[in-house]
């Protein structure tokens, strides 16, 4: 019923509004075009065109079929190339999760541009997660690869890891915060008076990591690092921020960095992927990272540059 020639005929008639013009486009006779459309209407049991002596126009059913037919025909035309890609070991879908600390719209766009040019028939899905939520996606939610899992050792022996670097932290507050000009290391008693600004771990199955907060201290949860930094600048609260994300603000005297009794150690992050079952797209992404190619440099900027 919906063979490629019939679909092309139907689309041509719909686009030209004429059997004769469709015949010219397809190098067929008008009678052949008319017969194909009549047969299609008989097989579907509905009228697809309103006919006048000079032109034809789509019925409601015809308009619906047109929107579907173009997609079907494009799918049929691309199928040989898609099948060859699958036969060559290329995945039909690749799910990639990115740690919130490494996430950058520009970095994702750069990687997607590179991937889409090489694997036009693969569906790519990116997700942004926080702390153990990155491992959670990889372990339990069908993700193929993770950019920025915590640590340098896998949580299961079915994964491979490539260390990316360690995030350095600074304890900050706004320049006009009451603690900003206190001399010497701050005490817990002094810190406890002000809210800790944190981003909640997005893990759903694994145990969530608890961000810095003293017993009895008020905590304010925000959705991302951009909001956290904005809250610090507004004097809402205090807390740790990656050094490359706040150093420029510290240099401008918009934020102040202080020492507290327990400073946060560097946070090592790694690339992680499944040992078995991966395809060529994942293999190529891994190569980009292990070889530190420019296409993925945006994900690693937090380890070696200052940005605000």
From Swiss-Prot:
**Which processes are annotated in GO (biological process)?**
regulation of DNA-templated transcription
Among the GO molecular function terms of this UniProt record, one is:
DNA binding
UniProt KW keywords: Activator, DNA-binding, Transcription, Transcription regulation
Record keyword Transcription present: yes
The reply on keyword Glycoprotein is no
Against Pfam families, the record matches this protein to: HTH_1 (PF00126), LysR_substrate (PF03466)
HTH lysR-type domain location is 2-59
* Database matches in SUPFAM superfamilies: Periplasmic binding protein-like II (SSF53850), Winged helix' DNA-binding domain (SSF46785)
Residue range(s) of DNA binding per entry: 19-38
Family, similarity comment:
Belongs to the LysR transcriptional regulatory family.
PANTHER family noted in UniProt:
HTH-TYPE TRANSCRIPTIONAL ACTIVATOR ALLS, TRANSCRIPTIONAL REGULATOR
Its biological purpose: Positive regulator essential for the expression of allD operon. Binds to the allD promoter.
What protein name is recorded for this chain? Answer: HTH-type transcriptional activator AllS
- What's the source species for this entry? Salmonella typhimurium (strain LT2 / SGSC1412 / ATCC 700720)
Gene this chain is encoded by: allS
């Amino acid at each position: 019923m919906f063979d490629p020639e019939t679909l092309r005929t139907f689309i041509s008639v719909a686009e030209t509004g004429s059997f004769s013009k469709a015949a010219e486009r397809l190098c067929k006779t008008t009678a052949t075009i008319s017969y194909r459309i009549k047969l299609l209407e008989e097989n579907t049991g509905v009228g697809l065109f309103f006919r006048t002596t000079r032109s034809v126009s789509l019925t409601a059913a015809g308009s619906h079929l047109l929107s579907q037919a173009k997609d079907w025909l494009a799918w049929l035309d691309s199928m040989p190339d898609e099948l060859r890609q699958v036969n060559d070991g290329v995945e039909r879908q690749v799910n990639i999760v990115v740690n919130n600390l490494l996430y950058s719209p520009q970095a994702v766009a750069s990687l997607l541009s590179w991937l889409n040019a090489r694997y036009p028939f693969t569906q790519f899905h990116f997700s942004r997660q926080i702390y153990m939520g990155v491992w959670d996606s990889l372990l339990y939610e069908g993700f193929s690869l993770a950019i920025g899992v915590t640590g340098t050792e896998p949580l299961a022996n079915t994964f491979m890891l490539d260390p990316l670097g360690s995030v350095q932290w600074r304890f900050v507050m706004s320049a006009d915060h009451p603690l900003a000009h206190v001399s010497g290391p701050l005490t817990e008693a002094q810190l406890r008076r002000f809210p800790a600004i944190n981003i909640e771990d997005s893990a759903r199955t694994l145990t969530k990591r608890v961000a810095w907060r003293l017993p009895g201290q008020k905590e304010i949860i925000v959705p991302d690092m951009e909001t956290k930094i904005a809250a610090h600048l507004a004097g809402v609260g205090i807390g740790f921020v990656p050094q490359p994300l706040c150093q420029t603000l510290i240099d401008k005297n918009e934020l102040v960095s202080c020492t507290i009794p327990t400073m946060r150690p560097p946070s090592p992050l790694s690339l992680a992927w499944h040992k078995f079952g991966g395809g060529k797209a994942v293999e190529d992404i891994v190569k980009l990272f292990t070889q530190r190619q420019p296409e993925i440099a945006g994900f690693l900027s937090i380890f070696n540059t200052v940005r605000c």
